[in-house]
């Protein structure tokens, strides 16, 4: 599974997932399913944010080409992928600037158009079950929940799916592709079932060539969302109100 993840996902997503697991004291060599799940969740969050802006009229628009002269504001603030300290700094800054209620748990995104935090979920189970689990944990009407599955299903708070159909279809297609790639290599069952995961781990320890023939079909292009986060948590210059909350990192 580890080899699959490293070949299937953008290197920067893999690096962020490694840092996240290290921060929580988890071993990606052992918890390979969690490694894959974190990478998948990160990618969905970035895809959710990519290309979405707010123009001068306050309207949400989709722009796929970078135009440095365009007076556009990123619609979504990315919180997922940052270390906990910086993530809470961003959340606090958003709350102070917008008057939004501070969430009890770290959300994944903030939507400047709808003025709400968003919790993104990616599940291997039934979407409604995972949605209820998220809702019971968060217990806040101010955090919008949007759940995606690997089968193309989705569920969102009050059936408000936030994004346009094409943007959501892009996410669903990517998730379905990941599932198919896992299934082709005998990894899907272990990804879904803990019992199968233990069996798969034993196989992985015996053979490190499980994904040797994996074709690298995924684009290595760094998404706009990922560029904002590189090389670390640099000032993205997205809004003047949040600018002071981001730490400057020395150039490498």
UniProtKB/Swiss-Prot annotation:
Ligase keyword on record: no
Keywords annotated in UniProt: Decay of host mRNAs by virus, Eukaryotic host gene expression shutoff by virus, Host cytoplasm, Host gene expression shutoff by virus, Host mRNA suppression by virus, Host nucleus, Host-virus interaction
Main location class: host cell
Active-site residue list: 80, 108
GO molecular function, one term: RNA binding
GO BP terms, alphabetized: viral RNA genome replication; viral translational frameshifting
InterPro entries named among the record's database cross-references: PA/PA-X (IPR001009), PA/PA-X_sf (IPR038372)
Annotated site residue numbers, Important for efficient shutoff activity: 28, 65, 202-203, 206
Site positions per UniProt: Important for efficient shutoff activity and nuclear localization: 195, 198-199
Stated family: Belongs to the influenza viruses PA-X family.
Annotated function: Plays a major role in the shutoff of the host protein expression by cleaving mRNAs probably via an endonuclease activity. This host shutoff allows the virus to escape from the host antiviral response. Hijacks host RNA splicing machinery to selectively target host RNAs containing introns for destruction. This may explain the preferential degradation of RNAs that have undergone co- or post-transcriptional processing.
Domains: entry comment: The probable endonuclease active site in the N-terminus and the basic amino acid cluster in the C-terminus are important for the shutoff activity. The C-terminus acts as a nuclear localization signal. The C-terminus is recruited to host protein complexes involved in nuclear Pol II RNA processing.
Name this polypeptide is given: Protein PA-X
Biological source species: Influenza A virus (strain A/Beijing/39/1975 H3N2)
Lineage, uppermost ranks: Viruses, Riboviria, Orthornavirae, Negarnaviricota, Polyploviricotina
Gene name in the database record: PA
